[in-house]
Amino acid sequence: MAKIEDCPGFETFGADVKAARKAKQLSRSALADMIHCDSRYLANIENEDTLPSLPVVIQLIKICGLPVERYFNPELMREESAERQRVSHKL
């Protein structure tokens, strides 16, 4: 299994999933059922930096409404952030 530190862009994936799950008022068990996995596995993803398989990542991104670019194209997100900072300074 890949390690989080070996996958740029996924450093916050677990925390993002947890925050989105709570924002949608889903229990960990309910979300685990939706992605057909054990709630302990989901807890490991959320809390212990476990990087799930690609199919599970895709399901979590869809269900939680997470921006796919953040994880699969982190450079784009950094560029957009830098551009937003430049624009906001001009406003």
Question: How would you label these PLM feature ranges?
Answer:
Residues 15-30, 34, 59, 84-91:
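Short basic helix-loop element that most often maps to the first helix and adjoining turn
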Residues 15, 39, 54-58:
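Short alpha-helical elements of helix-turn-helix
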Residues 35-51:
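Recognition helix of helix-turn-helix/homeodomain-like DNA-binding domains
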Residues 55-70:
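DNA major-groove recognition helix of helix-turn-helix/homeodomain DNA-binding modules
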Residues 2-3, 7, 69-91:
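Short, charged recognition helix plus adjacent turn
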Residues 17, 31-32, 42-45, 71:
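Conserved hydrophobic/aromatic packing and binding residues within compact polymer-binding modules
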Residues 1-23:
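A short, Lys/Arg-rich alpha-helix, primarily the initiator
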